[in-house]
Amino acid sequence: MVNAALPLLAQLPEAYRAFGPLVDILPLIPVFFLLLAFVWQASVGFR
């Protein structure tokens, strides 16, 4: 029963189809913040 529902849940509904690429990018935002923290600390000399 659960295995039959997984492909259905894996696809976005038609109304949200345009946001597909955005959904692919959103999980990467925390990684960018982590990298930004390292760049910031490197610029201030790791005080």
Swiss-Prot record:
Subunit architecture: PSII is composed of 1 copy each of membrane proteins PsbA, PsbB, PsbC, PsbD, PsbE, PsbF, PsbH, PsbI, PsbJ, PsbK, PsbL, PsbM, PsbT, PsbX, PsbY, PsbZ, Psb30/Ycf12, peripheral proteins PsbO, CyanoQ (PsbQ), PsbU, PsbV and a large number of cofactors. It forms dimeric complexes.
Function: One of the components of the core complex of photosystem II (PSII). PSII is a light-driven water:plastoquinone oxidoreductase that uses light energy to abstract electrons from H(2)O, generating O(2) and a proton gradient subsequently used for ATP formation. It consists of a core antenna complex that captures photons, and an electron transfer chain that converts photonic excitation into a charge separation.
Pfam families membership: PsbK
InterPro entries: PSII_PsbK, PSII_PsbK_sf
Example of a GO cellular component annotation carried by this entry: photosystem II reaction center
Recorded family membership: Belongs to the PsbK family.
Domain of life the protein comes from: Bacteria
GO BP term (any one): photosynthesis
UniProt key word Aminoacyl-tRNA synthetase: no
Keywords (A to Z) from UniProt: Membrane, Photosynthesis, Photosystem II, Reaction center, Thylakoid, Transmembrane, Transmembrane helix
Claim: Transmembrane helix is one of the keywords in the record: yes
Name of protein: Photosystem II reaction center protein K
Location of this chain's protein in the cell: Cellular thylakoid membrane
Removed propeptide positions: 1-10
Principal location: membrane
Topology term for the membrane: Single-pass membrane protein
Annotated transmembrane regions: 19-39
